[in-house]
Structure formats: structure tokens, C-alpha cells
């Protein structure tokens, strides 16, 4: 029986690991958390990858997201990045209804600095 090849746009563990490696090398984050449907296990084939990148300090979140998206270029991975400073994450991570609360509660930590 013929095996169907994995589509080039498919989310694979290898692509997720490579995205994490690139983000760590570029941003030196405190933590990277996979959240949303992929972390909950209810993702569809067309679901994107939601990643929360927690950095020591973020002066311009939009500029940082643009910078980090550039390092992911070429992976063919549908990624939605959210970048936040460590202090702000700690302030909102225990507030129900926030993305940070959901990421802390349901997310999967892909990377955490020592």
C-alpha cells in the first residue's frame, strides 16, 4: 500500500523543533509556550501554531514579532507569534480570560531557560 507523502505545509514535530531552535538562538527567551488548538490536541490540518515567546524585556512588541517572524521564514510553518516581557506575563498569567492565563494553564512549554 502506498503511503501518502506529508504535505510541505504540514506541521511536523521536526518543524516545530526547528522553529523553537531558531527562536531561542535569536531571542534568548525565558520561555516558549505552545498554546491554542495544537497544545489542546484539537487542531485541524489547517490550524496554525500559536507560540508565546516570553522574553526578559520587550521594548517594542510589534518590531520583535516582525524580527522573529523573519527568522522563521522558509520553514513553511503557519505560526502566530505572541511576544511579551517576563514581568507583564507574570502580571497577567493568573487573570482568567487572558491569552496568558490560557497559555499558562493549557500550554506546552517547548523551551525554558535555566
Task: Indicate residue ranges for each PLM-predicted region.
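Catalytic core of pol beta-like nucleotidyltransferases
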Residues: 1-31, 40-45, 55-114
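Glycine-rich beta-strand-to-loop/alpha-helix junction loops that act as flexible
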Residues: 35-37
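Short beta-strand->loop micro-motif that forms the acidic, two-metal-ion catalytic signature
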Residues: 50-54
Amino acid at each position: 500500500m502506498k503511503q501518502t507523502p506529508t504535505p510541505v505545509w504540514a506541521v511536523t514535530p521536526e518543524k516545530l523543533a526547528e522553529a523553537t531552535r531558531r527562536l531561542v538562538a535569536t531571542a534568548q527567551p525565558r520561555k516558549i509556550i505552545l498554546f491554542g488548538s495544537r497544545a489542546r490536541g484539537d487542531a485541524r490540518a489547517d490550524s496554525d501554531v500559536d507560540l508565546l515567546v516570553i522574553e526578559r524585556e520587550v521594548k517594542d512588541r510589534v518590531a520583535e514579532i516582525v524580527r522573529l517572524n523573519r527568522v522563521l521564514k522558509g520553514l513553511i510553518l503557519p505560526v502566530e507569534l505572541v511576544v511579551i516581557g517576563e514581568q507583564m506575563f507574570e502580571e497577567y498569567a493568573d487573570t482568567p480570560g487572558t491569552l496568558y492565563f490560557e497559555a499558562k494553564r493549557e500550554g506546552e512549554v517547548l523551551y525554558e531557560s535555566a
